[in-house]
Amino acid sequence: VYKRQFLDSLLERASKEPKTIVLPEGEDERILQAAHAVAARKAAKLIILGNPEEIKAYFAQNNWDMEDIELIQPETSEKLESYANLLYELRKAKGMTPNDARKLALNYNYFGTLMIKSGDADGMVSGANHSTADTVRPALQIIKSAHKERSVSSALILVANDKPYIFSDCAIIINPSEQELADMALASSETALKFGIEPKVAMLSYSTRGSGSGGMVDKVRNATKLAQEMLQSEEYKNLPIMIDGEMQADAALDSVVARKKAPDSQVAGQANVLIFP
C-alpha cells in the first residue's frame, strides 16, 4: 500500500509542473506501459524514441490514447544532423570526427541526451535494456556533472516495510575513495530531499563505532568526517541532513541493535540513506 502511495505522491508532484522526458527504449513494452501510466496522470510530456508505427499499434491494441506523447524515430528525424553537429563540436577536442558523431547520434541514448543538451527535453529515463555504462556515458560526455569538483555516483530507491530507502553507490564507483564516499553521502541526501525524504545517512562498514579495525574501517570513518564537514558549508548547513558512521547495517536499520552498538547516534536504527563502501 505504501509503495503505491509513494508513487502516487511523486506523480502528483510531477503533474503540477510537467517536464518533457525522453524515453529512448520504445521497443520495450514495459516502457510503453509506464509511459501510458505517466501520461494518463499528466505527470510529464513524453517523447518515445522508436518505430512510430509499432508504438502506435501497441497503444491502439490496448485502447490507450497518446495525448502528451510524441514519437520520434532518430533515423528519420529532421534534428539528426543538428544533433550530430552538436556532438561533434562537444567532442572534437577528444578526437571525434563528424562521421563518428553522426553514428553516435543515431544511438538512442545519445540522441535522447542531445535532445536535453539542445533544450528539446528536460530529462531522460533509460536503463531497462541498456547497461549502466551505456546509459551514463552519454550524459557524462554531453551534459556533464552538476558539480565539477565532485565525483559522479548513482543512487537507487527501494521501498520496503512501508519505508523508502536510498542506496549508493550500487552501479558506478567500484571502490570509492574517502572523498568519493563523502560526495555520495551528500549527493544521495540531495536526492532524498527531492523525493520528500528527510535523509538520515549511514556510512556502512563491517565496524560500528570502532568495533572493528582495518583500512576499510579507516576509509569509512574518514569519509564520515569529510561528509560532516561538508554539511557545515553554506550549501548544506540549513538542510535537514544527518550523517553518521562508521556503522554496520544492523546498527543502521535495527533500533534494538542500534541502542546497544550506537546509543548516542541520531542515525543508527533509523537510517534511510545507506552509503556502501
Predicted regions mapped to residue ranges:
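Anion-binding alpha/beta catalytic cores of soluble intermediary-metabolism enzymes, centered on
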Residues: 3-268, 272-277
